[in-house]
Regions:
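A cross-kingdom feature marking charged/low-complexity
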Residues: 2-12, 240-260
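Conserved beta-strand hairpin/beta-sheet module of binuclear metal-dependent hydrolase folds
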Residues: 20-73, 173-184, 188-190
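Hydrophobic/aromatic beta-strand patches that form the interior of the parallel beta-sheet core
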Residues: 36, 84, 110, 144-146, ...
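Metallo-beta-lactamase
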Residues: 14-19, 24-26, 30, 113-165, 169-241, 249-252, ...
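Active-site HxH/HxHxD metal-binding segment of metal-dependent hydrolases
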Residues: 63-65, 71-150, 247-266
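Short catalytic-loop micro-motif centered on adjacent basic/acidic residues
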Residues: 55-58, 83-84, 161-163
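C-terminal regulatory/interaction regions
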Residues: 2-8, 260-287
Length: 287
């Protein structure tokens, strides 16, 4: 189903969100010496490199140019043995769905136990304020099911799992080596700071807001100040910026939250080039 879902999003969401000043993905490149990203239209997938190990965070769309753009970064798809999945929406799992080209067919997937209930068909994913149910996603890769607070060690990489539900029921956020927090679709960065992610795409907006507040509380209690790396709006190392509007929603059709620096149509990726991917580290926001 991922190829159809990918094509639907490319056409429908391009039209729906054009000019709304919502999506501001990073272009393909490196954030620093450890973290790289590939741009797939409005979305980013990430790679964490430590020694000889490269861990992938989310699997993006069923995207024809993924292997090409990974080559710009010097990353071979065959080197990916572990993929952390924040949630099961098609712009985060497309490359591992059953009808994908199979670039990562041998990789092990790590996904929240609650989120996996979408994959088993126990629950259905609802979007557009619950008006539309998405088709069930099918993934054949080996899976490791995760729980809130679980800590993993993958080839010397420490990964801590935070359950942050709301956008989906089992959305997981990953803290990698205590420094990088991959937030998926829990945070949306506007020009004036972070908001709870796009309201029309959430299972439960009240829960999403509550979950963000709890995440901030956990981080502050432990004195953690990671890089916040989002799925659609870049990254920041400024915690105050990241949680500036945690009690508010990004509501794209009400113009309450927008970013004038966002692309008019983020599905136009003509500026995402190999040359630009090698031109220096990608800049953060809120700095």
């Amino acid at each position: 189903m991922s190829k159809k879902a990918t094509e639907f999003q490319r056409k429908a969401m391009s039209w729906m969100y054009r000019g709304k000043e919502i999506f501001k993905p990073l272009n393909t490149g490196w954030i620093d010496e450890n973290v790289a990203c590939v741009r797939e239209w409005v979305a980013n997938i990430f790679f964490y490199r430590k020694g000889d190990t490269t861990i992938m965070i989310d699997a993006g769309y069923n995207y024809d140019r993924l292997a090409e753009k990974m080559s710009w970064l010097g990353i071979d798809p065959k080197s990916i043995h572990h993929i952390l999945i924040t949630h099961q929406d098609t712009d985060h799992v497309g490359a591992v769905e059953a009808d994908s080209p199979g670039l990562f067919r041998n990789a092990k997937l790590y996904i929240g136990e609650i989120e996996n209930r979408y994959l088993t068909g126990e629950v259905r994913r609802r979007v557009i304020y619950h008006l539309y149910k998405l088709p069930q996603v099918t993934i054949n890769n080996e899976k490791v099911l995760l729980h809130d607070g679980q800590v993993l060690d993958i080839d010397g990489v420490r990964i801590e799992c935070f359950l942050v539900p709301g956008h989906t029921w089992g959305h997981m956020v990953y803290l990698v080596d205590g420094k990088y927090l991959f937030t998926g679709d829990t945070l949306w960065f506007g020009a004036d700071g972070g908001y709870s992610f796009i309201s029309s795409l959430a299972e439960d907006n009240k829960l999403a807001v509550k979950s963000l507040a709890l995440l901030e509380k956990k981080l502050r209690k432990r004195g953690l100040h990671p890089l916040f790396i989002t799925g659609h709006t870049g990254w920041t190392d400024n915690m105050e910026f990241a949680f500036a509007h945690k009690n508010e929603l990004c509501s794209p059709f009400k113009k309450r939250a927008h970013d004038p620096n966002a692309l008019y149509d983020a599905y136009d990726e003509s500026d995402d080039t190999e040359e630009n991917s090698k031109s220096g580290y990608l800049k953060g926001v809120g700095r």
